[in-house]
Amino acid sequence: ITSEEVVGWAFSPTKSKIAFTLAEVLITLGIIGVVAAMTMPALIQRQNEKATVVKLKKAYSVLENAYRLAKEENGDFSGWISGNDKIEDTRVLAETFKKYLKVSQDCGFNSGCLPSGYVKHLDGTDYVDYDSRDNEYRMVLADGTALMFHLETNDYLTCKKDEHCGSIKVFTGNKKSGYKWGKDFFILDFTHNRIIPQGHYEDRYRPFEQYCNITDHRRENGTGCAAWVIFNENMDYLHCPEKLGWDKARSCKE
């Protein structure tokens, strides 16, 4: 091959056209990569939210069924406990529930069933290190969901018919990634009759609009999200909080 042929090939119209086309492809791929980098985190977050909805709804259903069976066999929960020792009564409460649950790990009042460190408020600020508390009974279900049983008030034995006597905290996330109220950590109240997720329509203790608002910085913000997740099957309060409410839109799409 001669030098003239090489020069002619390098600068031929066909060669230039091919080079330009490859450049366009590379530019297009670069744009696609940038767009993917921008959108993938949002898509992953939405997928994680859907998984959380499924897991929390399942935990709620499992606990409701366990409570129903426990009452059928043992009567009202006030008959299970003495009312004299809050810690001992919490243990009896949790172990009674446990009989009707599939449990893979029982931590009792010890650490190990929850992430270490402080749980975060919905706005990201620290709240409490629940894994180190010694007054709440912890266990992990077969699907990895962690539970914490707690008798809330000193008059839990005589709490009124539809008022909460205690709570069951539900952790749906990964222990290695920490935990946050309203994202993977939720509260269910139990009364003499039923289990009720916090933040429901008539909740005066932790109403959704005040205690599940990512723009609010109040203490315990995020504790009022459970009912929204269970009944509306979304976590859109993380995306359009100003639009949502029990008397307003139930999702960002409305």
Task: Describe the role of every protein-language-model region.
Residues I1-F20:
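N-terminal leader/signal peptides at the extreme start of proteins
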Residues M40-L63, Y67-A70, N74:
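Aliphatic-rich helix starts adjacent to a transmembrane/signal segment
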Residues G8-W9, T28, R68:
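Short amphipathic alpha-helical "recognition" segments used for binding
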Residues S16-N48, K55:
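N-terminal single-pass transmembrane signal-anchor helix
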Residues K86-E254:
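Intrinsically disordered, low-complexity regions enriched in Pro/Ser/Thr/Gly and acidic residues
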Residues E64-G83, K102-D106:
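Alpha-helix exit/C-cap motif
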